[in-house]
Amino acid sequence: MSVVGIDLGFQSCYVAVARAGGIETIANEYSDRCTPACVSFGPKNRSIGAAAKSQVISNAKNTVQGFKRFHGRAFSDPFVEAEKSNLAYDIVQLPTGLTGIKVTYMEEERNFTTEQVTAMLLSKLKETAESVLKKPVVDCVVSVPSFYTDAERRSVMDATQIAGLNCLRLMNETTAVALAYGIYKQDLPALEEKPRNVVFVDMGHSAYQVSVCAFNKGKLKVLATAFDTTLGGRKFDEVLVNHFCEEFGKKYKLDIKSKIRALLRLSQECEKLKKLMSANASDLPLSIECFMNDIDVSGTMNRGKFLEMCDDLLARVEPPLRSVLEQSKLKKEDIYAVEIVGGATRIPAVKEKISKFFGKELSTTLNADEAVTRGCALQCAILSPAFKVREFSITDVVPYPISLRWNSPAEEGLSDCEVFPKNHAAPFSKVLTFYRKEPFTLEAYYSSPQDLPYPDPAIAQFSVQKVTPQSDGSSSKVKVKVRVNVHGIFSVSSAALVEVHKSEESEEPMETDQNAKEEEKMQVDQEEPHTEEQQQQPQTPAENKAESEEMETSQAGSKDKKTDQPPQAKKAKVKTSTVDLPIEHTLWQLDREMLALYTENEGKMIMQDKLEKERNDAKNAVEEYVYEMRDKLSGEYEKFVSEDDRNTFTLKLEDTENWLYEDGEDQPKQVYVDKLAELKSLGQPIKTRFQESEERPKLFEELGKQIQQYMKVISSFKNKEDQYEHLDAADVTKVEKSTNEAMEWMNSKLNLQNKQSLTVDPVVKTKEIEAKIKELTSICSPIISKPKPKVEPPKEEPKHAEQNGPVDGQGDNPGSQAAEHGADTAVPSDGDKKLPEMDID
């Protein structure tokens, strides 16, 4: 079973796998551990990753990047509207109202959903992992920003399904970093001790996230998170791009933003310049040849000037840091360390701001680029039964408060209540109780829209079906279980109606009490102390109490009333049972039919990419063969081909080369396969003659050595040398005969081959020589390597017990003499022989 962690970044992605030796970040086909989050669409196939990145400028309209933030967002979303001007490709509104990506693929215009494009990238990362692990990859853990909303998380989950992955957990990026940090720490405080508080700061290309975590031995608890969803490395790039657009506009009279390719080139150069300025404080040049209208442009920038231009961005670094301390109610002195990751934290001014705020040196013990993917791989290993990992519990938080809203018959209007407050532990479940006579709907929403980086606070609607009143017409008790799961996704996971049945007393009067207690126990196990706070008030004000209290009160009241009855009167007995209720939901998520369709389409596109790759490989094989043979015909193959054959073959190679760049530019795979076979029919005999000429002398030499060795053994045997005197004369004669035959065969073939021209096929082939060597060895080797028979040494006669003299006058004992006499006259058994020896010992 594979264990894979995927860091699905805005600009680049990383894949880590768990192996017996630990966690390893794997490299792609370009030997690079960083895979660009980029997909390019062509007339015949898709390019994904590094291959797509190289087409950003040449195929700008059909190369998609920066699509991560479109997950779960409507086309009318203000964020999407703001992003349009930064995109080289077109985005469109899909029939669902969501954002789609418009490209030309396979010679026709296509609209892809964000989930489909992300699935393409995930498929590529999956392929990379499979090529390294040499086995299928299914289970994985994928990272998402901690500020992702329910809709965005569901969208990423859909993308993983389209890619054929089973996502065990959507893991918040800062939580993954915290896991990578904490699981290897051996000096964490014990569970009963005060936890170690560590702040994790992650500033990537598109966003800025901060979390504070409490560590104990084998335990990680996220206390609070804060973020700036638009502050990242690309904002600093934009400062440079805008500066040089303005400078080059004045200096060279160029309107750079009117030409998307020029803008993309400038963006790439500005990103390089920003990275250089992180290590150099001096003036650095920026030069681009043939930038626009065949004009070369150049400019300079230094770190000091750059930081001045970024003052407003740097001012946004502190607020999230202050926010996590306020939320967690911690002081700066309570923070043990501040760990920074993410590419943008390499900017010196950013590091300085963070360090100054906490008043301590920053910790850089984690790999800034790979910490997230390593944390995801560790989480996948923890969840996988295939790996034994040190126990480490992870408690995350809910980033935004979640509330429920419903129609209240008692209040004749809407009622609502906060189910999960901000920074509530996750994953977590709660059981809520409602009193209803008919089906009802719960609307889940984020209760602080002002803090939400998303225009719509609505999460979903859940309709509880088949709710009926009790047999006496009263409202039924409905238990609803709500949950924030490991992915950070909210749902109403189940609903059950409690039916009350009254009957006469049976032989087991205590069963009702026991059932009630079990019911209460189950409810307590599933919920926190505040679970019942959002139950709906029943029709009668007197019943406005917690569920458990109502049950206990009603049972107690019933007993009190029945106490004064005559003994012969039968007591009423209450039994309860639960009935599961169906739930219908309205979500920002793809339905099963669309998921199946997109999965099928992804499979077709993968197959098309594979076929196109095979076609290109076949074409490249023809081109490679043409160049190889043309060079070798005038080189090492020159002696092995006649003048006429060389001229004919050379002409054929030239014709093939011209065909490749004309009619053969775009042909099916089989045409290239046939063309290569046609060329090899002319070239292979020449290549074979060359190879035979190279290998034949070596094999003849080996055969000659074998013959000499066996002749030497025969001579030694005839000279009656001790080493071979044990051999049978008939066997040696057999060796001599085989050796002489092999020598005659070799001399004959050598003479014929020496008379043969190199331009024709050889008289004897290497396979024949190898067969002769094998034949000679199989006959002679067993005979000459026959070992000498072992000469056994003469056996020593066993010593008798009577040879030992009497000890301490024992010889005078008559009994002893009798025993000795008996030993001399009788024939003892094996056991009897050993007895005297044992006595003497």
Curated annotation (Swiss-Prot):
Keywords: Acetylation, ATP-binding, Cytoplasm, Methylation, Nucleotide-binding, Phosphoprotein, Stress response. It is found in: Cytoplasm. The modification Phosphoserine is found at residues 76, 393, 415, 548, 757. It holds the Pfam family HSP70. The modification N6-methyllysine is found at residue 774. The keyword GTP-binding does not apply. The modification Phosphothreonine is found at residue 540. GO terms for molecular function: ATP binding; ATP-dependent protein folding chaperone. It comes from the Eukaryota. The keyword Isomerase does not apply. Residues 500-577, 783-841 are annotated as: Disordered. GO terms for cellular component: cytoplasm. Residues 514-533, 789-802, 830-841 have a biased composition (Basic and acidic residues). The modification N6-acetyllysine is found at residues 53, 430, 680. Belongs to the heat shock protein 70 family. Interacts with TJP1/ZO-1. This is Heat shock 70 kDa protein 4. The gene is Hspa4.
